[in-house]
Amino acid sequence: MPTQTREPLHMPPPPGLSVIRPHHATIGLLALLGAAVAAAPARAQFLDATAAAAGPGRGDVRTLKYKVGLVVTAEGGPCTGLYATLPVPDEWPEQKVRIVAEDVSPAVRNLRYRTLPGGVKQMVVEIPELPAGKQARAVVTFELERAAIVVPDDTAGLRIPEKPDRAIKAHLGTSPYIETRDPKIAALAKTAGKGLDGWRKVEAIYDTVRDKVEYRNGELKGARRALADGWGDCEELTCLFIAMARAEGIPARTVWVEGHCYPEFYLVDATGQGWWFPCQAAGTRAFGAMPDQLPILQKGDNFRDPDRPGKSLRYVSEFLKGATVKGAGDPQVEWIREGG
C-alpha cells in the first residue's frame, strides 16, 4: 500500500475523523509507558505558583482526560507491515501528562514513543499482520493537568535576547506559511515597534496584527496573504504575529491546542533568564497570558519527521504506511483524539 499522511485542514484534524492509516503495536506495559511519560525534560517542569516576578504566572489548573490512538480494519484482504505514527500530548511548563489507561489489541506487537527534533512526541504503532476483516486498536488515555497562564508581575525589565542559544534561535527563521523575510511584513513589524523595546515592542506588534487582520474563517493562506487580504482565522493571525516578531529578532512559535492555535514569544530578564509567553492572536484579547486550558498538542511550526524525509512540517500529523503485496487489503483507519 502507498504511504499515507493526513495533514491538518487548516487546523489539526478533528477527533473522530476516519482516514486510512496504520498503527503501532504495543505490549501492555502501562507502568513502563507511564514512566517514560513521567521522565519529563527540564523544559517540562510545571509552572511554579510562586514563579519569578518577570516569568509567566500560573493560574487555575484544570485536570482532564484525553484519548489518543487509532482503530484499523483490514478491508478487501489481509494487511501486513502496518506502521503508524501519531502525535500525543507532552509535558510543558503549563501542562503535566501521565498515562492512566491503555486499550491495545493482541495484533499490535509493538508500541513505543519517540520525540522528534523540536519537541513533538509521537506514539509509534506496528502491526505485522492483520487478517482480512479483522480489526486492531491502540488507544491510550492520558490525564492532563493544564494550567492557565497569567501576566507576569513585572514586565518592565524583559527584553529581546541578544544572543539566543541554538534551541531558541531555531524560532527566528522562516517556517511553512510564516514568511519572516517578506518585505511588507518586515516593514510593518519595524514600523509597529519603532522606538519600543522588550515587552512593549512585542505588544505593539500584537496589536498591529489584530488591527490589520480581521478574524474570519477561511482557507489556509499564511502570513503574507493574510496581511494582503486583511483577514484570516487563528492560523493566519498566529502566522503573521510570528513572522513580524521574528523579523524584529523576537523568537516566536506556534502553540497547537485542540481545535485552535496561538503564538508564544520569548523574552529574557536582566540576568539572561528567559521565558515563553503566550498571546491570543484571534478572539478575545489576551497578551502575555492564556486563560484557555485546552490540551496542548504541539509547540513549534517547522518540524522534520524521519518518516517524511525532505518535508518541512508546520504541524506533525498522523502517518501510515504498509507493505505493498499482491492481493493485500486496504487498511481503513479511524484516528482517535477525544477529550478536552
Segments and roles (model prediction):
Residues 26-36:
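Bacterial N-terminal signal peptides
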Residues 7-28:
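Bacterial N-terminal signal peptides that target proteins for export
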Residues 136-137, 144-229, 240, 316-340:
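Secondary-structure boundary elements
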Residues 44-149:
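Intrinsically disordered, low-complexity N-terminal segments that are enriched in acidic
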Residues 146-147, 212-213, 231, 258-261, ...:
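Solvent-exposed loop/turn segments at secondary-structure junctions
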Residues 236-316:
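Hydrophobic/aromatic-rich core segments of domains that either
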Residues 38-44:
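Boundary at the C-terminal end of the N-terminal hydrophobic targeting segment
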